[in-house]
Amino acid sequence: MGALIPSSTLFNIFDFNPKKVRIAFIAVGLRGQTHVENMARRDDVEIVAFADPDPYMVGRAQEILKKNGKKPAKVFGNGNDDYKNMLKDKNIDAVFVSSPWEWHHEHGVAAMKAGKIVGMEVSGAITLEECWDYVKVSEQTGVPLMALENVCYRRDVMAILNMVRKGMFGELVHGTGGYQHDLRPVLFNSGINGKNGDGVEFGEKAFSEAKWRTNHYKNRNGELYPTHGVGPLHTMMDINRGNRLLRLSSFASKARGLHKYIVDKGGESHPNAKVEWKQGDIVTTQIQCHNGETIVLTHDTSLQRPYNLGFKVQGTEGLWEDFGWGEAAQGFIYFEKIMNHSHRWDSSEKWIKEYDHPMWKKHEQKAVGAGHGGMDYFLDNTFVECIKRNEAFPLDVYDLATWYSITPLSEKSIAENGAVQEIPDFTNGKWKNAKNTFAINDDY
């Protein structure tokens, strides 16, 4: 597929049974459990082990296996470092990493060094050096990593990709995207009954993501979650495959949303009402590409708002904007020549349905119930099928490093009043001749 390490050398270090992929999980929280569910529904996967110090989450993951008629996974739950013992197991081919962001680097690098293929959940890096580490370790060990960005597989996004590849948008000029999602109920809870949004605690007093994710809003100020927005544009603009991201500039608004949420739900006397939040409510990042396109990302998760990732794809002959969560009718579209220069929007519905990506047409029924409207099926299916077929991942370690780098670079830019930051070429020039093979057929 699309990685830049030759596919013929990807898996030659493994004693590998292509009929059944033996998979383990580092972290089986709410996101990890989605992958557990998808893997448990497959006959070509054996779930070997879970590494997670949280017995409640491990119990939930084991229930998923039981529900799907699978045997219990071996558990490595003796503290934060027990995952290292799991990685010693020679009967594991691949590992899903779905841990808190600050653990991604340690877990991903350790898994590759242990010879385990990595499916890495997405976020942003803590430091730029981490991004280089992913690339260097993958190249040195020959162990591949797939970036698990599910929005690349969203149905409307893939239909637009299909139209882009058919030339309907002409030459692409500009794109926007982001993470525009009211996360306040995710960032705070009571920590008592496992329900998001039922309180205003975070950190050690909280449950699930609020235990760790909210601290990033307290201590950082940047584009914390770039991959949902940049990933789909990346596939349409051939980033790292004939094109690349060159530089960025970021700005952050004031921070008001989280404080107001705490006061409204917990009162002005609540201790967390005194917390000073560094993360701006709205962070915008403008990116310049080698081939002349521009990209604007928006991080907007601390204020009241409906869900919308804010996609815009604009070319010399077409324009699409979305305003919802991925339904076919939740967008506007315009093609100058086809619409006879009418200067009037058309609903995206008929266009999304007519140009539905062949992969969605073929696998729609398999995707039912797979999470996030079915796109998680396609994401996880690609991971497994590439391993089984000894093919390189279409979203690879170079893509992960590129996307992850946006976060620390945006933090630096904001701290320097929007100063332009150069985005490294993590491919070391290989992007010039690499080919885009993301979703090029109806298979995976």
Curated annotation (Swiss-Prot):
The keyword Zinc-finger is assigned to this record: no
Record note on biotechnological use: Specifically cleaves the blood group A antigen at neutral pH with low consumption of recombinant enzyme. It is therefore a good candidate to participate in the development of universal red blood cells by removing blood group A antigen.
Keywords: Glycosidase, Hydrolase, NAD
GO molecular function, a single term: nucleotide binding
pH dependence: Optimum pH is 6.8.
Entry-linked PANTHER family: BCDNA.GH03377 (PTHR43818), GLYCOSYL HYDROLASE FAMILY 109 PROTEIN (PTHR43818:SF1)
Entry protein name: Alpha-N-acetylgalactosaminidase
Lineage: Bacteria, Pseudomonadati, Bacteroidota, Flavobacteriia, Flavobacteriales
Gene transcribed to yield this protein: nagA
